[in-house]
Swiss-Prot record:
It is an enzyme of class 3 (hydrolase). Pfam families: Asparaginase_2 (PF01112). Heterotetramer of two alpha and two beta chains arranged as a dimer of alpha/beta heterodimers. This is N(4)-(beta-N-acetylglucosaminyl)-L-asparaginase. Changing C163S: In AGU; most frequent mutation; abolishes autocatalytic cleavage and enzyme activity. It comes from Homo sapiens (Human). Cleaves the GlcNAc-Asn bond which joins oligosaccharides to the peptide of asparagine-linked glycoproteins. Its EC number is 3.5.1.26.
Length: 346
């Protein structure tokens, strides 16, 4: 009788543990913006082969750089107003809070790789422009042209359309009608219309990636070639910690995609992580970030992905007539393949 009555008691802790495992969100976890499946797979392979969260983020973003995801990541896309493709990237370690980033990187294809070298081999956070290229070469990266026939054609067509759209305002000649060079009107009294950006809504498809290792270590990163026909030297939100992405082992991680010139003003990734630190569900945290920006820029294009320390994840986006749903990729220990998920924009 004693043996029979003790058996259920002995099983209680085991059954409780099993129930808790099923109810908790599984780790490891990879989440990235947009349906960039191969990037998700590359990150997962890095984890499966014993790599760290940083290794996974670097591998995933590097895959998109090689594949030129959606023309908005890597070489051969988004030429600036001079016809040059430049790259921004960042990687962040949520354990040490170290960050490595590059902005306006020229003639180096593997931007996320250079960003990691900044993290590992300097005490700096961000290197930019030609100096970032010099650093990359010292780290063994190859200096090569990032332009392609496709990017050159995009630029030629833009010039033929009188440089429309562009990102200038309050200058002469009128940027809504003519190409530059531009200059401030100075003391000349001229009726210069306020220039309204007419960007392609899908022209900001940065890859942002969040990885949570099975040990709980968290990393996040980004890579992009920015926006088409940007002013030469422009750096977006992607390489800015707290804007493009943010990671903290004690709270979670987030990454943003969209109009970087607006997003960076609100540090959405940092804000989302802080919401999760307070106990907000990842989806709610993402929605709150979007709502904060909406109050000032109701027509902005943008989305955010979030994941907390348990592996729960979510996303949110700003609803526009041309953008009503946001797609992102998820891979965790319960899935046998990367899965595309969608959220309705708010």
């Amino acid at each position: 009788m004693a043996r029979k009555s003790n058996l259920p008691v002995l099983l209680v802790p085991f059954l409780l543990c099993q129930a808790l495992v099923r109810c908790s969100s599984p780790l490891p976890l990879v989440v990235n913006t947009w349906p960039f499946k191969n990037a998700t797979e590359a990150a997962w392979r890095a984890l499966a082969s014993g790599g760290s969260a940083l290794d996974a983020v670097e591998s995933g973003c590097a895959m998109c750089e090689r594949e030129q995801c959606d023309g908005s990541v890597g070489f051969g896309g988004s030429p600036d107003e001079l016809g040059e493709t430049t790259l921004d990237a960042m990687i962040m370690d949520g354990t040490t809070m170290d960050v490595g980033a590059v902005g306006d990187l020229r003639r180096i294809k593997n931007a996320i790789g250079v960003a990691r070298k900044v993290l590992e081999h300097t005490t700096h956070t961000l290197l930019v422009g030609e100096s970032a290229t010099t650093f990359a070469q010292s780290m063994g990266f190859i200096n090569e042209d990032l332009s392609t026939t496709a990017s050159q054609a995009l630029h030629s067509d833009w010039l033929a359309r009188n440089c429309q759209p562009n990102y200038w305002r309050n200058v002469i000649p009128d940027p809504s009608k003519y190409c530059g060079p531009y200059k401030p009107p100075g003391i000349l009294k001229q009726d210069i219309p306020i220039h309204k950006e007419t960007e392609d809504d899908r022209g900001h498809d940065t890859i942002g990636m969040v990885v949570i290792h099975k040990t709980g270590h968290i990393a996040a990163g980004t890579s992009t070639n920015g926006i088409k026909f940007k002013i030469h030297g422009r750096v977006g939100d992607s390489p800015i910690p707290g804007a493009g992405a943010y990671a903290d082992d004690t709270a979670g991680a987030a990454a943003a995609t969209g109009n970087g010139d607006i997003l960076m003003r609100f540090l959405p990734s940092y804000q989302a992580v802080e919401y999760m630190r307070r106990g907000e569900d990842p989806t709610i945290a993402c929605q709150k970030v979007i709502s904060r920006i909406q109050k000032h820029f109701p027509e902005f294009f943008g989305a955010v992905i979030c994941a907390n320390v348990t592996g729960s994840y979510g996303a949110a986006c700003n609803k526009l007539s041309t953008f009503t749903q946001f797609s992102f990729m998820v891979y965790n220990s319960e899935k046998n393949q990367p899965t595309e998920e969608k959220v309705d924009c708010i």
